[in-house]
Amino acid sequence: MTSADRRRDAVARIIRARRIGTQEELLAALERAGFRATQATLSRDLARLGARRVSGPEGAVYELGADGADGGLAALRGLVSSIAANASMVVIRTHPGSAPAIARAIDLAQPPEVLGTIAGDDTIFVAPAGELRPRRLAARLAELLGTPSALAGEGGERTH
């Protein structure tokens, strides 16, 4: 493993372990872990790791790109405001700026129930695959996103 690989591994560990909001915070944490890097190097490392800043209820923080069976959905829990379904689709409402990241994570997770997603700034349209009923899809998405599913249903009912 090269020194660059070790440094990137350290960056990934730091991002997973702590809420990091700026590159300056990340550089300081990296230095405490025994690694020296410039801001330009760190920026390239973040791009290579697929890291991005995601807005959440407590401000923007760095998160890693999708890695794992859930496409990174676990990291996005808490950013969903509601999930509603009608006879043909599911609508997910999110915190402002979060919809693209959540839609991408859903797409990367490739749940067989999902045909595709379309995201705006704070709203995602989810098309169910095949003959799957949107109510069942809403419940499955609520499970994946850590959102209560008791009220997920058709006819515009909301989960949260």
UniProtKB/Swiss-Prot annotation:
Protein species of origin: Anaeromyxobacter dehalogenans (strain 2CP-1 / ATCC BAA-258)
GO terms under biological process: L-arginine biosynthetic process; protein complex oligomerization; regulation of arginine biosynthetic process
This protein's name: Arginine repressor
Upper taxonomic lineage: Bacteria, Pseudomonadati, Myxococcota, Myxococcia, Myxococcales
Function: Regulates arginine biosynthesis genes.
Predominant localisation class: cytoplasm
Entries under HAMAP family matching the protein: Arg_repressor
Protein family: Belongs to the ArgR family.
Source organism, top-level taxon: Bacteria
Keyword set, alphabetical order: Amino-acid biosynthesis, Arginine biosynthesis, Cytoplasm, DNA-binding, Repressor, Transcription, Transcription regulation
GO molecular function: arginine binding; DNA binding; DNA-binding transcription factor activity
InterPro entries: Arg_repress, Arg_repress_C, Arg_repress_C_sf, Arg_repress_DNA-bd, WH-like_DNA-bd_sf, WH_DNA-bd_sf
Localization of this protein: Cytoplasm
Pfam families: Arg_repressor, Arg_repressor_C
GO cellular component terms attached to this protein's record: cytoplasm
Pathway(s) the chain acts in: Amino-acid biosynthesis; L-arginine biosynthesis [regulation]
